[in-house]
């Protein structure tokens, strides 16, 4: 499949749709044989062109792109025309994918068992009106703390109890991130109220009870996290 008649030099183009720019972007491809593309014929005034879509996941690293035949120079060209955007250190995302939280994807891609906790988890459960200035993310104590461009406050939680109340959020087709459920989050805000603040912890508990939360669920968790029990029990007695 070539552009123009048989007398012309054979040329190939990588053409992708950019949602950001609202138009097709065309990039010359010197040797398409070395790349893995899905090719679709498109009639134009110059003959038949080729639309090539690189077989890359929605979010990928440079190493993954390189493994599929894209050089650093070509990856930069894809960024220049708006087909790909850099969303973190060494992390890229195709612009023709659905919108996603780039910060959380970067954290999920680089950290071991990252889990939204404390204020970030309260916000997810609609137990606070405070907008978290950074992402509160728990990782197991002893795990490597990665360097990321996203604003994040890392919290080291004990490995033995790390999975208690841990659920997850799907971010895209490739990545998911952990999230502590509401009872675990409330207990954490009371045992770590020096980091969150007593007013935020008390309001979160008040809202949770208002929406049908059962105090017994929290008291069971205090057997695992005894540091939360005194302040939590006192606040429950005041509210109830």
Where are these regions (language model features)?
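Basic polycationic patches enriched in arginine
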Residues: 8-11, 25
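Nucleic-acid-binding surface
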Residues: 50-70, 74, 79, 87, ...
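Glycine-centered, phosphate/nucleic-acid-interacting loop/turn motifs that mediate DNA/RNA or nucleotide
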Residues: 82
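Short hydrophobic alpha-helical segments enriched in small aliphatic residues
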Residues: 21-22
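Short, positively charged and aromatic/hydrophobic N-terminal segments
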Residues: 30, 34-38, 44
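Short, composition-biased local secondary-structure segments
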Residues: 41-51
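Tryptophan (W) side chains
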Residues: 12-13, 17, 39
């Amino acid at each position: 499949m070539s552009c123009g008649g048989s007398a012309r030099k054979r040329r190939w183009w990588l053409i992708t749709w950019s949602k950001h720019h609202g138009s097709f972007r065309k990039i010359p491809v010197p040797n398409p044989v070395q790349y893995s593309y899905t090719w679709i014929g498109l009639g134009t005034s110059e003959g038949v062109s080729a639309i090539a879509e690189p077989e890359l996941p929605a979010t990928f690293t440079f190493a993954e792109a390189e493994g599929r035949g894209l050089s650093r120079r070509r990856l930069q060209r894809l960024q220049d025309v708006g087909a790909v955007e850099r969303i973190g250190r060494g992390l890229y995302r195709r612009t023709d994918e659905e919108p996603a939280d780039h910060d959380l994807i970067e954290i999920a891609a680089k950290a071991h068992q990252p889990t939204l906790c404390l204020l970030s988890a309260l916000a997810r459960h609609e137990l606070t009106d405070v907008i978290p200035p950074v992402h509160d993310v728990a990782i197991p104590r002893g795990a490597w703390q990665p360097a990321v461009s996203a604003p994040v406050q890392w919290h080291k939680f004990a490995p033995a109890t790390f999975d208690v109340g841990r659920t997850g959020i799907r971010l895209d087709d490739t990545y998911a991130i952990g999230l502590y459920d509401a009872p675990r989050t409330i207990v954490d805000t009371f045992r770590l109220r020096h980091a969150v603040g007593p007013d935020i912890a008390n309001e979160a508990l008040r809202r949770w009870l208002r929406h049908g939360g059962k105090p017994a669920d929290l008291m069971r968790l205090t057997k695992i996290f005894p540091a939360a029990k005194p302040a939590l029990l006192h606040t429950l007695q005041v509210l109830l």
